[in-house]
Amino acid sequence: LPNATMIRSLIDLLRNLQSEEDCRLFLENIRWHGVPVCPHCGSKSEEHYKLTNGGVFRGLYKCKDCRERFTVTVGTMFEGSHIPLQKWFIAIYVFLAHKKGISSTQLHKDIAVTQKTAWFMLSRIRYSIRYNADIDFGDITQVDETYIGGKNKNRNAGKRLKNTRGRSLKLKAPVMGLLSDGKVYVEPIPKASKWILHGVINSLVPKGTTVVTDGWYGYKGLSENYVHKVVDHHRGEYVKGGYHTNSIEGFWSQLKRGIIGVYHLVTRKHLELYCDEFAYRYNTRNLTDGERFSQFLSIAKKRLRYRMLIL
């Protein structure tokens, strides 16, 4: 049976997962580890009934307990999709392996689907990532905020906006990031106010731990619940007493380069999905491309419907 150790590169994927049957067996191995699990009632058994069509078994089971029918794709991002699993696997592999991602205009050429289909596939992948973000914030958490968007000077003269300097929200969307033990959590926020910044930190970071920020006024008062270390960049401070925000600022560089270089433009509506995409790659940077691919398949349990995406 095809298994995770066989996929170490895109060539391995194409060589070992040539048919829909190969892909189905691989996904069953990743998700079920050899024993089918009913997604309806959770029953795990080798005695689930295998249903055939014309005498051929194609992965359709009937639960011996709840009697519901299921396949390995039910309850996953692949459920209800008419796109062959091999195309899905190729899309997922290159999406995760490329440090800055891949655009829908490129993907649709690579796997021979329409650009609209490629865009929806990438959105489904990001959506699945979004609902599997699980980070434990340790003893020290770096916190910072940044702004995602274009520059006013690059707009056509007739479309330039007034009063867009500094932290103006007319052109750019504020994004907040928290990094601890090498893992980053990213969340778009309405504005970088004290009330919002404190709210996010209080909801995620255990009280009494150390929080490191820059000198932005929105972080004032954190010392009431945390050991608050401030590295004031305006005073030329970048490392203070061993504390810094260099790691989260390095992540911002990756995020911005990826959006500008590959996607060019991201709307505020979908910004959260793109932030989660880059956070997932960052958080799994110590895995090989094959390991990251297999890990993603094991957690890809959220299905995004098209109407949810465009509303």
Whereabouts are the PLM-identified features?
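Residue-level recognition of single "structural anchor" positions
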Residues: 1-311
